[in-house]
Amino acid sequence: WFPKKKGLANGFTTMGHNCGSAFYVPLVSMMIATFGFANGLSYLAIGAIVLGIVGLLTIRSKPQECGLYPDNVTKEVYEREYFDGGKDENGGWTVVKLLKTKEMWLCALIIGINQLVTTGVMSQLVVRNTGLGFTQEAATGLMTVCALIGVVGSYLFGAIDQKFGVKKAILLFLAWYCVALAINCTDTTMGVYISVAMIGIAVGAAANFIVSLPASVFGRHGFTLVNSVFFPLMQIVLMTNYVVNAAALQITGSLRGAYFVYIGLLVVNMLITLCINPTKYNKDYAVEDQLKKG
């Protein structure tokens, strides 16, 4: 729907991702307390089914199905500035061809490391803060605040993505994340408060890039196939979090030390990000570039 406005589009849609993180656990607790374990979870399941049916009836895969054009542009702009050639649903890609493409592996590594670090940080945040003297309730509350602040991060980095491109947005995100974790490692109360706010923004931003980076590199043509290859590869990198986490704790002997390992991974990810061409196979941007040259 939004091939050239994906930054802002992802900025808005991933707000829901962060709201879900902030409110789902309290919602489950409230439902169980009110209706009991079985009934409470059953009502949530029914709500999810109803939401799915509403989505099935109202959501369309392509804007043309609603008489519209991508990015809400006019027909004239679409025909002039967007690629509309070819009827191949896969955009000329095959699974084997994608697996042989360097950019596919770069996308999987970049986003996988982002998510690896985010999963590691968030899974340890409560334990880390209780270890610094916060009560269990206060530490849990800080995690909820972190998720809510992520709503701001989603929009902020979505706007940065839209303005400067996904590559520069990711590099800024990685630098921001490094500073946030470094501040947390000061082991001070003020440092915790500042880092929770900064980590919240980073967590919100991280969700944006899961779609934005591969969509920017490969474009909308054949993206369903691209995503079906990219996502499992990214998940494999993400799931090494548990091995990395355990090794970091064993080597450093503390959660603080593990955070320094995460900072190192983020720095490595900056170097990987510098290697990627963010629009290499994007046919819409290719048309736009030709217009600028011609």
What are these model-derived regions, one by one?
Residues W1-F2, N10, A205-F218:
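Intracellular juxtamembrane helix-capping segments at the cytosolic ends
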Residues H17-C66:
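Helix-loop-helix hairpin linking two adjacent transmembrane segments in secondary transporters
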Residues S21, V217-T252:
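A late C-terminal transmembrane helix in Major Facilitator Superfamily
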Residues F23, L27-G36, N129-T130, I160-D161, ...:
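Interfacial helix-cap and linker-helix signal at transmembrane-aqueous boundaries
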Residues A33-I46, A247-L266:
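A membrane-interface helix-boundary motif in multi-pass transporters
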Residues I46-Y82, I272-N277:
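C-terminal membrane-cytosol helix-exit motif in multi-pass small-molecule transporters
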Residues W93-F157, N241:
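Extracytoplasmic gate region of multi-pass secondary transporters
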Residues T144-F157, D161-L213:
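C-terminal transmembrane helical hairpin of 12-TM major facilitator-type secondary transporters
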